Amino acid sequence: LFRSKQGLTNYWGYNTLNFFTPHAAYATREAQFGGTGAVLREFKGMVKLLHEAGLEVILDVVYNHTAEEGLGGPTTSLRGIDNKNYYRQTPDGAYVDVTGCGNSVNTATPAAQRLILDSLRYWANDLQVDGFRFDLAATLGRDAANEFQPEHPLLLAILDDPQLESVTMIAEPWDVGMGGWQVGKFPDGWSEWNDGYRDRMRDFWLTDIGAARANGSAPNGIGSLARRLAGSAHVFSQERGPMASLNFVTAHDGFTMADLTAYNSKHNLGNGENNRDGTDNNHSFNHGVEGPTTKKDIVDSRRKAMR
């Protein structure tokens, strides 16, 4: 509703109504016609088949906000149960938004902590998923004053819960609020997306090549690449080690791999934000032409870079 009021329609499935049900639209048509029970059975069957194929299932979970529009809009989620306990608010009752989605779940309260833990236990034990990737996880570690705390009770409780002992926990270690970038700050036992690794890999394989073509030399060199490949020890403590870093190059946010090799700048012109949304710092290189092209040498260079 927060997005639809702005005239936007594509929310990527990240405006959660509740924390305990699969999104029915992702199920087969047959399961949808069969109702919620059929959707749930199909999800369980999917997990079972993936396990039989030797694949673990990591569930992307959004506990940092819900689909509530705001105080002036209809009640769609936790506000109808306990608005004060479940949402971060200013003294006058306005929602504190450190997520960019209109509200933030107040994980400083025991009620919100219990709800999230119950949800994790349900997905891990009843539905047998193997791990979780936590969207905007820095929000989950904010205290009553909205400050991030590495030893936040919820972050520790997730690790200490005996029902979640063997479950993988992966943090997207930032949000859009003040002090939101917390890479390397989560407790031992958490893995974190390493955006420094992402950017350095893009530089080495893309922007350095572009700079070398234009200027005859690459600005970054191999030293910082080696540091990232060795585990980003300058970011993650010795106690946590390199396994705390989840290295990646692209994700659902921002440029795809194809975009990285085809655009020097973002062109988000079709979603009503006038190209303001998304970062301008994409560490990309178009290989000589901005956007799609049929030139064979450029197409070949882009494919090689993606590989």
Give each language-model segment a name:
Residues 128, 144, 149-307:
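Conserved alpha/beta catalytic core and glycan-binding cleft of carbohydrate-active enzymes
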